[in-house]
């Protein structure tokens, strides 16, 4: 996910500046109401929960108090910009089911499954659960062996379903979004969120 050359880095900086500029036309109250963030008017600051940490965003510059990955930061700004307050029905969808997700989203669904198979290889269930928990996940009962819901952004949970290895099959996993995801991020940003989750999972396993 890290950009390697200067042209691409410049493109990233332009996207960042454009995102901040759009947000500066909006009030903190409005952004909070639509995104699920908390606005502290006395400090002119937004507070956003992402994974296991609370990120403070200082208005009007939109500086943050965290050393999160730059793409995580840009996605957070895009989320604040696009959020319209739509409630979800808890129905899960794949990335390919996103609006405009047919090509990019479907490709990510396949890539994520391949990466998860490698990531989960030789990991025991307890270790997998611990890695998810360390990223702030909550667990729900489903037909999968493990279902972890990650609080990636206030109204943008990401669900990871895992089937543990048995005698016939290796461990496998799939990532899902909720059916209102299109109201909060574009398919490009959704894929970035998925990549961030995979990266964080990889780091969480390494630190156990």
Predicted feature residues:
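Conserved binding-pocket/active-site segment within a compact domain
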Residues: 123-183
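Short, charged/polar micro-motifs that form catalytic or ligand-binding hotspots
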Residues: 66, 114, 118-121, 146, ...
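Short Lys/Arg-enriched alpha/beta "domain-start" segment
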Residues: 1-43, 72, 80-138
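Domain-length accessory/inserted modules outside core catalytic folds
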Residues: 46-47, 102, 106-117, 141-144, ...
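Intrinsically disordered, low-complexity regulatory segments enriched in Ser/Thr/Pro
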Residues: 52-78, 163-188
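Short, hydrophobic/amphipathic alpha-helical patches that form generic packing surfaces
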Residues: 70-85, 192-200
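Amphipathic, interaction-prone secondary-structure segments
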Residues: 30-59, 138-164
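A recognition module on extended beta-rich or small alphabeta surfaces enriched in W/G with H and D/E
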Residues: 178-208
